[in-house]
């Protein structure tokens, strides 16, 4: 018989940090990643929370993530540049890149920072909200592996390519918008898989485009 265990967000964050450190991540990267995942779960975005831990641990074990990346920023203009992530942990890499973007925007009034050589970066909302909390308007976009089927198609071709936006509000929490360009984010399917639940008919297609045969198939 399964036993339901209830954890506080702080406890969950600490457990994830310990697991990431045990997998080989340095303290700083593990702490930032665990914080990111815990906030995702705390805000109801379970598709990008603790459910991702096994995937990350597997990627680390297979050498798919650089444990101690040599991060660098290449400035291409007064308020633009490329942040090189050296294939480090996505949440850690992108958080460092956002720090630079915020600094440049405060200096110049506007900024653009591209990030290359990184891994799965979690929720885009996490980064744009940081900028909004610094009284800045932010837009973040990210490509992904091809998972989306074009209209009328039967094969994956486009990425989910998430887009996020945030803006500050006086005396209130920032406005934050975060979406995938597909019917649902891939993480929602992972979440359903972890819970052994079927997915709605219109979330995915098979090679025949049969909606009736899709239910739960990808889970």
Predicted region positions:
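N-terminal and secondary-structure boundary signal
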Residues: 21-24, 39-46
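Short, well-structured alpha-helical segments
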Residues: 27-38
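Active-site cofactor/substrate anionic-group-binding motifs, chiefly glycine-
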Residues: 48-102
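Generic N-terminal amphipathic, Lys/Arg-enriched alpha-helix
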Residues: 1-23
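A generic, well-ordered mixed alpha/beta core segment in the N-terminal half of proteins
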Residues: 82-170
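Phosphate/diphosphate-binding glycine-rich loops and adjacent basic-rich segments that engage nucleotide
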Residues: 148-211
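Conserved small/polar residues in nucleotide/adenosyl-binding loops
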Residues: 212-219
């Amino acid at each position: 018989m399964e036993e339901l265990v209830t954890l506080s967000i702080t406890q969950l964050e600490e457990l994830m940090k310990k697991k990431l450190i045990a997998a080989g991540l340095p303290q700083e990267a593990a702490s930032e990643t665990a914080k990111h995942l815990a906030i995702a779960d705390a805000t109801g975005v379970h598709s990008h929370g603790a459910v991702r831990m096994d995937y990350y641990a597997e990627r680390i074990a297979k050498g798919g993530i650089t444990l101690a990346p040599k991060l660098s920023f290449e400035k291409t203009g007064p308020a633009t540049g490329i942040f090189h992530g050296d294939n480090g942990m996505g949440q850690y890499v992108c958080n460092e890149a956002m720090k630079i973007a915020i600094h440049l925007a405060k200096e110049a009034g506007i900024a653009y920072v591209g990030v290359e050589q990184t891994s799965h970066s979690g929720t885009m909302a996490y980064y744009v909200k940081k900028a909004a909390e610094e009284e800045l308007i932010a837009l973040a976009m990210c490509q992904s592996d091809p998972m989306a089927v074009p209209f009328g198609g039967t094969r994956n071709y486009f990425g989910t390519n998430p887009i996020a936006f945030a803006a500050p509000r006086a005396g209130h929490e920032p406005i934050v918008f975060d979406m995938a360009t597909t019917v649902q984010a891939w993480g929602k399917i992972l979440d359903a898989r972890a819970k052994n639940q079927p997915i709605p008919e219109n979330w995915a297609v098979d090679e025949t485009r049969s909606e009736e045969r899709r239910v739960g198939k990808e889970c």
